[in-house]
């Protein structure tokens, strides 16, 4: 156990309660935070679901709003003293509606998983049939995977991708829907590198009399700028996280153009699934939505996609197999089987070299989820940092060096990894965080 945990806690008296900084009262926590800052500052982040928020977003999240309970919705709270947090939440709602060109928004979900759960609570009954993309094809746990609540409470039917193209086969999805007659079909996922045809999904749900829920957590930033087609004209309800490509605080959100569905969603979020909203996080969401409404955000998203294409192209020249042959979005899947490597093995080697990513299953993967045959890479965080095409070309070459080093020495190649780590640190020093 860390020796710092056994140290006596300082006495924080009323006289210094509002003035004593974290470093003076909780040195173990402060040290861990500082170490994490150093890690983020000195390493390259390629986890596709992560990003780097602005200083303004962080400041909003660290305000006195953390003190305020506000069960209910603006103008309809169960507590007094909510006039100012009402303003904050209404700003977040109006900006979300403007950003995604929709009629209704609920900004209270604590996460994307909570948002998905609230939709299911609002629109489904236990035992109903749902259809979602399988995990190995690029779906998400909350879309009906067996370990998740959605896989336990509902009759979850999973669709996959075409074995040849590794993309969604809409004819196969239609055939499954006609066979199983689901109450809801879920589109979206956590590892889909190609554009999703939401109009095709709407055609299928209309044919079988189902509801269409789109989880756009990964592509929300792309949708906001028009870089990916919006699901709002087609979906009955849309969920998203507020981080990832949207570059806000960690949280969730639910959007719809249906007043009837909106009312059900509001009741499902509170009091159905959650209690008090996290008002400091909602403030940070409002700030992030405001940033995303600015013209520079479109430039950012265009760079995210361009950088992803560059990274994929470089990796292909280094002998890597990119699932579907490339990407239309911010992420890519690398099939490691041609190099005889495993996802967990490569994740660890890249981290030793100062590059963080995650092991990830690939379509029709025969490896266990904690091993996998692939890795997932994304460009949002690096692009937020200021990396452009030239930097991502370098990053692609460094990843290629680490992979080739592993092929030569499967237990790890310290010489290669240490050399890459030096280059990574030098690059990161040119693009510091929060300076």
Swiss-Prot record:
Superkingdom, natural source: Bacteria
Binding site for (6S)-5,6,7,8-tetrahydrofolate: 135, 139-141, 260
Molecular function per GO: glycine hydroxymethyltransferase activity; pyridoxal phosphate binding
EC number: 2.1.2.1
Pfam entry (one): SHMT
One Gene Ontology term, aspect cellular component: cytoplasm
N6-(pyridoxal phosphate)lysine sites (modified residues): 244
Gene3D superfamilies noted in UniProt: Aspartate Aminotransferase, domain 1 (3.90.1150.10), Type I PLP-dependent aspartate aminotransferase-like (Major domain) (3.40.640.10)
InterPro entries linked to this entry: PyrdxlP-dep_Trfase, PyrdxlP-dep_Trfase_major, PyrdxlP-dep_Trfase_small, Ser_HO-MeTrfase, Ser_HO-MeTrfase-like, Ser_HO-MeTrfase_PLP_BS, SHMT-like_dom
GO term, biological process aspect, one: glycine biosynthetic process from serine
PROSITE patterns assigned: SHMT
Cofactor dependence: pyridoxal 5'-phosphate
Subunit structure of this chain's protein: Homodimer.
Protein name (Swiss-Prot/TrEMBL): Serine hydroxymethyltransferase 2
Gene that encodes the chain: glyA2
């Amino acid at each position: 156990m860390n020796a710092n945990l056994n140290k006596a806690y300082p006495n924080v008296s009323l006289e210094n309660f509002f003035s004593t900084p974290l470093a003076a009262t909780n040195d173990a926590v402060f040290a861990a935070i500082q170490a994490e800052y150093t890690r983020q500052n000195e390493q390259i982040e390629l986890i596709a679901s992560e990003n780097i928020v602005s200083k303004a977003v962080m400041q909003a999240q660290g305000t006195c709003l953390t003190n305020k309970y506000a069960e209910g919705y603006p103008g309809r709270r169960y507590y007094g003293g909510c006039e100012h947090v009402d303003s904050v939440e209404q700003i977040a709602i109006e900006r979300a509606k403007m950003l995604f060109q929709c009629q209704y928004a609920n900004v209270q979900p604590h996460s994307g998983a909570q948002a998905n759960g609230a939709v299911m609570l609002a629109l489904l009954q236990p035992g109903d049939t749902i259809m979602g993309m399988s995990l190995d094809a690029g779906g998400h746990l909350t879309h009906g995977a067996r370990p998740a609540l959605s896989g336990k409470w509902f009759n979850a039917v999973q669709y996959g991708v075409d074995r040849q193209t590794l993309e969604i086969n809409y004819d196969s999805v239609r055939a499954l829907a006609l066979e199983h007659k689901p109450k809801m079909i879920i589109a979206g996922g956590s590892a889909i590198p190609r554009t999703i045809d939401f109009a095709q999904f709407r055609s299928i749900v209309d044919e079988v009399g189902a509801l269409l829920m789109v989880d756009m957590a990964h592509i929300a930033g792309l949708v906001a700028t028009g870089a990916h087609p919006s699901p709002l004209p087609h979906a009955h309800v849309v969920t998203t996280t507020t981080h990832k490509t949207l570059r806000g605080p960690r949280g969730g959100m639910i959007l719809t153009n249906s007043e009837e569905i909106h009312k059900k969603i509001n009741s499902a979020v509170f009091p159905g699934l959650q209690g008090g909203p996290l008002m400091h996080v909602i403030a940070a969401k409002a700030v992030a939505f405001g940033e995303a409404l600015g013209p520079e955000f479109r430039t950012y998203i265009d760079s995210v996609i361009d950088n992803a294409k560059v990274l994929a192209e470089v990796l292909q020249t280094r002998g890597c197999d990119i699932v579907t042959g490339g990407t239309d979005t911010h992420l890519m899947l690398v099939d490691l089987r041609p190099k005889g490597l495993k996802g967990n093995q490569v994740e660890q080697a890249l981290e030793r070299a100062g590059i963080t990513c995650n092991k990830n299953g690939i379509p029709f993967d025969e490896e266990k989820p904690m091993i996998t045959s692939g890795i997932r890479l994304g460009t949002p965080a690096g692009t937020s940092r200021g990396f452009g095409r030239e930097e991502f070309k370098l990053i692609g070459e460094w990843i290629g060096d680490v992979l080739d080093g592993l092929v030569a020495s499967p237990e790890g190649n310290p010489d290669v990894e240490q050399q890459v780590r030096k280059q990574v640190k030098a690059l990161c020093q040119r693009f510091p965080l929060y300076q």
